[in-house]
């Protein structure tokens, strides 16, 4: 086991373009926020190491493009993911309607036991909110996945969302240590330079 950390988890952020996936990642990894953020082209990732229950967890968080034309590119990134955060914009009904389609993508490409979390972002825009909290919560309950509303702009629940995901993955790993050891999905990830933080397509 690498002495620098006890766990290495690969997380994915998925959802429609413009819902704030990159802003959530920027807020969690760098505690910063940009009002104007260039759409992700393909895939970007950042790394943040956190402490939880006396364990050091390295989170490698992949930010995927929401545009339809990148769907086939990003499908390969579902493989080996331990947790997937599905993001919609609380001020954009269509982005919420498309959550079911994103869940279908998870079913198609990800591991059967992957941890999921539904996140309604931009909760600070209360005057423009069109997706009721109750509606989203009922949908998440129906799908059997946790739900949280966040604001990357003012940092509401951003830390909590990622930490809750890390905790749920850690609990799952602890309950099935044999399976976790038998399928080291993190081996190829460790081949990546750990200090690679810049976007692969920053232009």
From Swiss-Prot:
A lipid is attached at residues 200-201 (S-geranylgeranyl cysteine). Disulfide bonds: none annotated. It comes from the Eukaryota. Keywords: Cell membrane, GTP-binding, Lipoprotein, Membrane, Nucleotide-binding, Prenylation, Protein transport, Transport. GO terms for biological process: protein transport; vesicle-mediated transport. It is found in: Cell membrane. One of its GO terms (cellular component) is plasma membrane. Its main location: membrane. Its expression is weak in stems, higher in roots, leaves and coleoptiles, but highest in flowers. A motif (Effector region) lies at residues 37-45. It is a lipid-anchor. The keyword Membrane applies. It holds the Pfam family Ras. GO terms for molecular function: GTP binding; GTPase activity. GTP binds at residues 15-23, 33-40, 63-67, 121-124, 151-153. Protein transport. Probably involved in vesicular traffic. Belongs to the small GTPase superfamily. Rab family. NCBIfam families: small_GTP. This is GTP-binding protein YPTM2. It comes from Zea mays (Maize). The gene is YPTM2.
